[in-house]
Amino acid sequence: MDQTYSLESFLNHVQKRDPNQTEFAQAVREVMTTLWPFLEQNPKYRQMSLLERLVEPERVIQFRVVWVDDRNQVQVNRAWRVQFSSAIGPYKGGMRFHPSVNLSILKFLGFEQTFKNALTTLPMGGGKGGSDFDPKGKS
């Protein structure tokens, strides 16, 4: 991406790459709106494509989870692990289990986890995992 772009063109670029990931796009918008004045005053970070690296996970793993419920019925759920950044240490981030979980939500949470972990000053990167599995009422 051209290094002379505006905030809106950067956000449009993120939205176009993953048009159905509204939760993730909203998180990027909130963070970048805050960071943009600093980045305009410090162009060296933009020249290093720091923003493009921040908003693109290093790795996304999608897999199915097959299990047998209490009625002896086979169930299949989707699961993901989003590994956002290992720039300052190994990926660290929890798991979320809820029927509404999808890749956009986990990218949003992993993106935010990267910043939360960086603020601790401990050598931890950011990631998040989860599944659309509903744990309520399960044995």
What is the predicted function of each stretch?
Residues 1-139:
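N-terminal ligand-binding/catalytic initiation module
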